[in-house]
Structures are given as C-alpha cells and as structure tokens.
Amino acid sequence: MTPVTTFPLVDAILAGRDRNLDGVILIAAQHLLQTTHAMLRSLFRVGLDPRNVAVIGKCYSTHPGVVDAMRADGIYVDDCSDAYAPHESFDTQYTRHVERFFAESWARLTAGRTARVVLLDDGGSLLAVAGAMLDASADVIGIEQTSAGYAKIVGCALGFPVINIARSSAKLLYESPIIAARVTQTAFERTAGIDSSAAILITGAGAIGTALADVLRPLHDRVDVYDTRSGCMTPIDLPNAIGGYDVIIGATGATSVPASMHELLRPGVLLMSASSSDREFDAVALRRRTTPNPDCHADLRVADGSVDATLLNSGFPVNFDGSPMCGDASMALTMALLAAAVLYASVAVADEMSSDHPHLGLIDQGDIVASFLNIDVPLQALSRLPLLSIDGYRRLQVRSGYTLFRQGERADHFFVIESGELEALVDGKVILRLGAGDHFGEACLLGGMRRIATVRACEPSVLWELDGKAFGDALHGDAAMREIAYGVARTRLMHAGASESLMV
C-alpha cells in the first residue's frame, strides 16, 4: 500500500473549529490520490466514520496503492474508479459509472437512518446525478471544487444547495498559479524539449490559462491565448489559425479543438490538456485513429495520413501522470478549503443558506490562506497578490453599471471580487474583464498615481474593499509580498498602456 501523506494545514484548520462529523455521510467523486486520502484522514480525526464514506475516482487520477490504503481504512471505493475504454469518451463512461455508484451508495448508507449527507464533487457529475435522482426531502448539501463542474450545475434545479469552492477567491488567487506551474513542469518534463521558437497556443483565458501564459511567455517567442468570451483579448480565427501552432495547450474545461479541426492541425503538433477529463481536444476522436491503448497515461502518436499529432497523456490533464501524489505540499490549500467546506456542510441549514450556490465565506478563506502561508508554502512561490488574509476588508454589493472609480480619480482602495463581472476601460475602450477571484487597484496605490482606468460592474457583483493605508501597511512589513505586488502592478500598467517608468 502507498504511504499516506499528511497536511498540517488541514489538521490546523479542522482543530480550530468546534464541530464533530459523527453521523455524517460523505459521498464523493474525487481524485483517488494521497492528497484526498490525507484530507479524509483529517476528517476522521474530527468524527467522520470511514464506514460512512463512499468514493469513486477517475481513471486518470486513481492510484491503485492509494485505493488499497483507503480500503484498509474502511472507506468504500468503487470498483470502476480506474475503468477506461480508450475508444469511448471519458465523460460518457464516467457518467454511467457515477449513476450506478450514487444509487448504490445512497441505498446502502441512508437505509433506515436519518443523517446529513454531504456530496463532495470534482466535475459536477455526482451533483447532477444526485439532483436527478433525489426528491426535495433529502437532507443533502453539495460541494463543487472545479470551475468546469460549477458550469455544469449552475443552471440545474438540483433541489439542494451547493457550496461553490470552484469560484472562491482563495482558490482562484492562490491555487491557479500553483497548478499552472505543475502543469507546465510536468508537460515539459515528459517531452524532449520545446524550442523557444515554437509557436504556442493556449485555449482559455481563465485563471489556469492566464497563469500558463505568464509562465511560458518569458521562455518562448510566440505564446498566443485564445478565448471566445467577449472582451477577453484580440480575437483569433481558430479554424484558419490553428495550423500555425507547434504546441496547443487546452485550458477551457470544454472542447476547444473539436474533431472537425483535427485535420487542420500542423503536422507534428503537440497537444496537451491543462483542464479536466479528455474533452479539450475531443480526444476520443483522436484515440479512435490509433490502436486502443489501455494505459490512459500513454502519450499517443496519431499518424494516419490525415492527422499527425502527439496527444500527451491520452488527452487527459498532464499534471495527472499516474503518480500517487499530484503536486506537492502546496496542495494543502485545496484540501483545507474542501475540509472546511465539509465541516460547514455538515451543520448548514439549507433553508438559511443565502443562495443555491453559496461561496465559502471570505473569513474562512482568509483564515485558511493565512495558515497556508505560515505552514506550507513560502510566499515567494506564489505569483498572485496574497492579501485575502489581511484584516480590514469591507464587503460591497454593487448593481450592474455601477462605477467603482473613474480614470483620473485619486486612488485610495484595493479590491477583491467575490462574485460577478467587472470591466476596466481606458479612454472609453474596454481593455480587461475581471471576475470572481480577480483583484485590482494595486497599481495606482503602489505608484502613487491617479487611476489609470475606469472600472465598472457588468452585472450585479460582490467585492471586498481594502483601505489603501491597510494595503500599504501590509506590504511595508513583507519584502516578498511587496515584490509580488509590484510585479502585478507593472503588468497592469503595461496592459493599460501606461509607462512602466511610472512605477519608479
């Protein structure tokens, strides 16, 4: 069996909350790796009974040694956790397995008893299945940890509330750069090396795609980012442009390069997924052009006369490479957010929750982030401005069309977006769109300038406002934090067309 790692952060977060999970049922769809097992063991120490836990994994992120260790603890692990049929799409296979797993687990764990059931999901499939099968009387709270999963369920009438870890500020601000670094490191370790002259396309300008671009641009002559959302960046006519790239990295969580574009790809192109499942490149269509390979981590060479491409990791995310541990100690942040969400879900009153998909409270997030910085990861390892744990935030709810500040005004606050969408305009032209987890306002505070852009809400939004003096005090005592802040500010100034010399 594989040894189980430990995360001091998760234990510290749980120890600081006076709650007990005795009698709670946990049904989960998760990566069956050391990270998840470590979190579950921490939950066992606050009363969760392993016999009340049922989990199902995904073929590309299930390690057999971890499965054995989980079963030795008394956890029920579904036999189809590592099932893989290469000529069938993963989502089709997985949904079928999850439907059976949930029906069997619900019947077995809830028969003859009244108990709170927490559904912990990665990808939205478990929550969607539960919503279709259960009636309104079920005592259920859901948790979703991925943006793709949140998108899958956000329009569904599930009949129970879902805690939205996926779009929490802490996850977006801190985890995305860490995952981007891991994806990049893993991808390039598994190739012979990519020349600096290679043209790279990243599909998806979300948190992961943007962080990947930041990592790759200093190393390569051409790194383009494609996103179909309005206002994200310079449009790319993908069908006409796709043949010009040597490497394509998918980070949309959806199908960014469908089968209809496969024969337009440049010969020898390298395809790597940085999202979830195998949907980024319609990978099943590429796998059907090859002899079936039962190893979902195989790098597949597709060369059938019409398509010449290498599909890394059979189209699955390259940061899952078959190892028992995905990432390093920095994964403690994600595990702590999930553990805190399980504790919250165990006692939350559904009728009193503010919305069907509430965010984990910013106070909880700040507590977790502060502990994360102190216990597990040096500040220098983070490439986003770490300010969620500072006291002094004021929560703002703004209507669509509301202007936070105007270009040329005096700068006196820093902002973090909890939910909604805002846009930044320079001379009346939209230059940037901002969503949950984004922060803004630091550039002018650091440079002692007036506002270089106007920022207004595109839809009803919730923000957290920090006074400029508190912002300055936080940076004054921490040289590493100050350096990160200046780096972010320089990027913002250049995006707005201002001179970097204004920072001096």
Swiss-Prot record:
Keywords: Cell membrane, Membrane, Transmembrane, Transmembrane helix. SMART domains: cNMP. It is found in: Cell membrane. One of its GO terms (cellular component) is cytosol. A nucleoside 3',5'-cyclic phosphate binds at residues 372-492. It is a multi-pass membrane protein. It comes from the Bacteria. The lineage of its organism: Bacteria, Bacillati, Actinomycetota, Actinomycetes, Mycobacteriales. Disulfide bonds: none annotated. GO terms for molecular function: DNA-binding transcription factor activity. The chain crosses the membrane at residues 146-166, 196-216, 330-350. InterPro entries: Adenosylhomocyst_ase-like_sf, cNMP-bd_dom, cNMP-bd_dom_sf, Env_Response_Regulators, NAD(P)-bd_dom_sf, RmlC-like_jellyroll. This is Uncharacterized protein MT0113.
